[in-house]
Curated annotation (Swiss-Prot):
Belongs to the urocanase family. Its cofactor is NAD(+). The lineage of its organism: Bacteria, Pseudomonadati, Pseudomonadota, Gammaproteobacteria, Alteromonadales. It comes from the Bacteria. It comes from Idiomarina loihiensis (strain ATCC BAA-735 / DSM 15497 / L2-TR). The active site is at C411. One of its GO terms (cellular component) is cytoplasm. Binds 1 NAD(+) per subunit. This is Urocanate hydratase. Its EC number is 4.2.1.49.
Amino acid sequence: MSFTRLDKSRKISAPHGTELTTCNWQVEAAKRMLMNNLDDEVAEHPQALVVYGGIGRAARSWECYDKIIETLERLKPDESLLIQSGKPVGVFPTHENAPRVLIANSNLVPEWANWEHFNELDKKGLMMYGQMTAGSWIYIGSQGIVQGTYETFGSVSRQHFNGDAKGKWVLTGGLGGMGGAQPLAATMAGFCMLAVECDESRIDFRLRTGYVDHKATNLDDALKLINDAMAKGEAISVGLLGNAADVYSELQQQGVTPDVVTDQTSAHDPLHGYLPQGWTLEEYKAKQESDATGTVNAAKESMAVQVRAMLHFQKEGAAVLDYGNNIRQMAKDVGVDNAFDFPGFVPAYIRPLFCEGIGPFRWVALSGDPEDIYKTDEKVKELIPDNEHLHNWLDMAKERISFQGLPSRICWIGLKDRARIARAFNDMVKSGELKAPVVIGRDHLDSGSVASPNRETEAMQDGSDAVSDWPLLNALLNTAGGATWVSLHHGGGVGMGYSQHAGVVIVADGTEEADKRLGRVLWNDPGTGVMRHADAGYDIAKNCAREQGLDLPMLDTK
């Protein structure tokens, strides 16, 4: 079989409107969302099938992509398509309430679960890296991480600055698909931000889509923009063209200490995701092929320089946090023994939300009409009338977030709200208030769907950080509940060997059957997050389980 990764002639865009090209809306949704992942306005490098996160792909090759589309277009309502690391490998009879697509991406037996072995298989065309929402077809552009980042920066503001971020600034690295959300989220939370990015095209993309306010090509100009804005009490963001390790070190040498320091480069993948100091992008890309080992070593040494600077900033009083790209581990691998002295963002700022099943709930309007999203925004406000913080988020999102590809929205809600909101959306489709069905999903970064000891499950209070039964149970339960597609991935966010995680997507098509499926799946899915945290002993999760009536047989066992 031929194997084409790069095809510069490709330009993918998901169909809009109400005309079906498949047997029903469940299958149509899978087709459109796969295509949407590769839209030029959504993906980082769509002609190479790369959606975000280093080499996170939507399909293994263009031949596989074409065959997936062809298979979805002939799939019957009682069949399920199986995807193995981006390749369509089988269609089997199931039933109409079963998932239409079942996906497994990047999974390796633990002894072989490392980048070296994965890269061998990847070169042979036997695997692909699915990241989290790239290979599970529910990426929505940088908006997908904006609210989570906004929630984190809001928590940083409350914990360290009495809730007032005015006159404070954040230093970070990386403006890719995930990192690109940081500048907008920071300014929404009241901070100024300096974001270092080595690829100028990424800064330009974030400028064009409104995620970053200014571009600078040297540190002095960037700092002047930041300082002038803070003096006026304004919150702005600056994308600085440069190498993160260089800039962090230069700030340290100048004696400049930011108020908050983090990083969202693709440090999880040292071969493809982190530019070594002193290298050009062209040199980096060439050496990925000619000297993979040397490239990885050089990238990790540069990460160590950056992490040492972050540790220095922490000693100088900055609030320093790992934002989930595993840069601490990479630095520790090459001798920074105290790399973990600064915390990850989940245990420091997000875990109480996870204890209530609260996480990144997202939905997409298959009509392609932004008005459908604005109507659902208002429905969420109507159904959750007393959450001013959520209302503020939805208002800011409408005003400040540009849609990428099919119109979409994200908001962090939990066990008590997801199912009832999804069923309300289904009623809106049924009544014709929405022009077409709505796709509902989430990030794999959620309360019950991931095991990642250096990120989502870092520092669990019972020591169960590395137990990965939980995402497997989550995927099994969502399959049994009737989700439209379910995925099981390895290595997302933090790289090979460091995480296992599950995704779920379900369609609200206005039918009675969909109403029942939505009620099951979107109760069960966040319910597994409350279950996982209650099992680990968190009182917030135990109380939530009791209040919401979860049936957890060991809940009150001493």
